[in-house]
Each structure stands twice: as C-alpha cells, then as structure tokens.
C-alpha cells in the first residue's frame, strides 16, 4: 500500500536522485520534478554541460525517473527566479550588503513553487535532497542538523515556513554522504557517484559575480567608480573599483598594499567607501538580525536564550545570547566574531536544533562580557 504521493525536486545529481530512490523503496508514489531557474549561457557563461539547469542534468534526472518507473516533469521558474532572486542579488550589492541567493531561493522560490505544483498534482508531500532532519514536537516543526555534519544543510532551511515544513520529507538527513554513494552503487546508479558536484551560484557564470553585476546594472562602473579605501579612523589610503565589488572579510583582490594584511571591515555604500582594517579590527561583538523566521520557539520576546549562532554557511558557529526586541534579534557573542557581513543569513542553534534565523542587518562592537558572563 502506498504511503502517499510525493513530489521530489530532482537536479540530476546523486543526492536528489537517491532521495527519490529511498522514498520509492519506502512505498511512496513518486513524481520527479526538475526546476529550470536560469539560463547559464545567456547570462554570459561558457556552454555548461553539467550542473544546475543544464540539459545534461535534466536528462540525468529523467533517466533516474524512467529507471525507477515514475513520471518526471520540468518546471520553468526562470521569470519568477529573475524577478525575485536576481533582483535581490543586484540590489543587495548596490546597498553595500552581501546577499545569500541560495537561502533566499529556498525560502521564497523553490519551496513555494514545489508546493504549488504538488497541489496541482495531488501530492501530499514534497521532498528534497538536503542533508538535514525535520521532526514534529510541541506543536512545532523543527529543523535539525543532518547525521553528516560535513554535509549538514540545516543552515539553508531556516527560512522555510512551518506550513511548508509540515509537508516536507528529507530522507537524506539520517545518512552520511559516503553512505549515499554506497547506496547509489549498490542500486545500479554508479554514474551518479562519479558525477561532479556544482558548488557555484547557479546564475553566476564561472563564479564571476563582478562581471555579472556589470552586465545586469547599466553604467554600474560609472556610478561607483572613484570611491575611497579608508582605515577605521577615516584615513584615506587609496581608491577602489566600486564598493559593490567587495565584501566584508575580503582580503584577496583588494589591489592595495599597506605593508601588513588588511581586510574589508565595513562597506559604506552611501559614501562610496570601503573600510579596511586588521584581522582584529574585523571582529564584532554582536549583531542585529531582522526578517526573522522562528522555528523551534515561535517567540523569544522577554527571554534570554543561549545559542550557537552561525553567520555564514560554512561557519562552525559561536556561543551567543539571543534577545528578541520586536522583529529584531539582538545577538551578543561571547568572543569577537570575524567577518559578519550584512545581507548574509544568521542561524541560531540549540544543540542540533534550528531555533530560527534571519538576515544580518548590522554588526556592532560592544563586548558581551559587559552584559553577560559567558562560560567558556
């Protein structure tokens, strides 16, 4: 007896393919779906044979579906993707922030598009190949880290709504990547094991985001040229190529030599300035996070909550105290955290559970020990 009908997001890679395989073996009725989000070549890239949205990847997903005997469809969301994700990407850089398009796409494009199509196809559930887990507890759907901490993708799912989580299956969360490769080999999908994985942003040709911005924004270089590199005290030490071409924490590619290592510590878009400093000057003691989506706990108003907070995808996280003030989360770190970039996602953890997350609005220097005693 079938457990239910599931719409599986399939990129053609090993993770989403084995997601479909596992659910098929568990007795679900599967419909595979591949999203076309962007035309890589039209955005200035060389012909791309592999990776997200390529013809080869679509064919790979279809071949898995045919092999397992379930239907496969293609969903073209390029217009929606461009209107929301691409527009946000350019506007964030023009505002001096560093966007995270993959998290934004998960939250506002992919899940919504999957659920809308699932409804049309009478699918009770959707599924993806993320390495994370979801459980239902105390009336809440809680995202938690996957078994494979090296591949854990819970950070990317902080923005998915409770309603969406209630219909989401993540079968890879209880496996490690080597285990998934072994399953693929055992089930006759050895070609998936050797297929290269794409880690680039799907719409950035050859990882050249500067070139992408120049093509997307008319007269960008004219708008932002002639800006100043300054030190933390305001001393002008050089001229930069345009503030949108830099990000907080950047050291390489600055085109300036001061006799000691310097990093971008702040971007002042309104002044067309890029602030440079030492590694120590890059540290911040806290930050303000807005546009929150709370998971494990719906509201932290009036509470002080200990957490481990991540400020970027590959960040192991730092001990922090959370204080919610309306729609702003104040985050106080026990020790200085480096390269907190406005525009990136901040995700709050309690153990392996995602408490919630939001977008970094600003960071500040205010030693947390003046307010809290952190046990280290």
From Swiss-Prot:
Protein name: tRNA-specific 2-thiouridylase MnmA
Subcellular location(s) of the protein: Cytoplasm
The protein's Enzyme Commission number: 2.8.1.13
Biological process, per Gene Ontology: tRNA wobble position uridine thiolation
Record has RNA-binding as a keyword: yes
Cytoplasm keyword on record: yes
Active-site residues per Swiss-Prot or TrEMBL entry: 105 (nucleophile), 202 (cysteine persulfide intermediate)
Entry-linked Pfam families: tRNA_Me_trans, tRNA_Me_trans_C, tRNA_Me_trans_M
Highest taxon, organism lineage: Bacteria
Role played: Catalyzes the 2-thiolation of uridine at the wobble position (U34) of tRNA, leading to the formation of s(2)U34.
UniProt site positions, description: Interaction with tRNA: 130, 344
Disulfide bond annotation, renumbered to this chain: 105-202
Keywords: ATP-binding, Cytoplasm, Disulfide bond, Nucleotide-binding, RNA-binding, Transferase, tRNA processing, tRNA-binding
Entry GO CC: cytoplasm
Main location: cytoplasm
Parts forming coiled coils: none
Residues noted as binding ATP in the record, renumbered to the chain: 9-16, 35, 129
A GO molecular function held by the record: tRNA-uridine 2-sulfurtransferase activity
Positions of region (Interaction with tRNA): 151-153, 312-313
Reactions this protein catalyses: S-sulfanyl-L-cysteinyl-[protein] + uridine(34) in tRNA + AH2 + ATP = 2-thiouridine(34) in tRNA + L-cysteinyl-[protein] + A + AMP + diphosphate + H(+)
Family: Belongs to the MnmA/TRMU family.
InterPro entries on file: MnmA-like (IPR004506), MnmA-like_C (IPR046885), MnmA-like_central (IPR046884), MnmA-like_central_sf (IPR023382), Rossmann-like_a/b/a_fold (IPR014729)
Entry-linked SUPFAM superfamilies: Adenine nucleotide alpha hydrolases-like
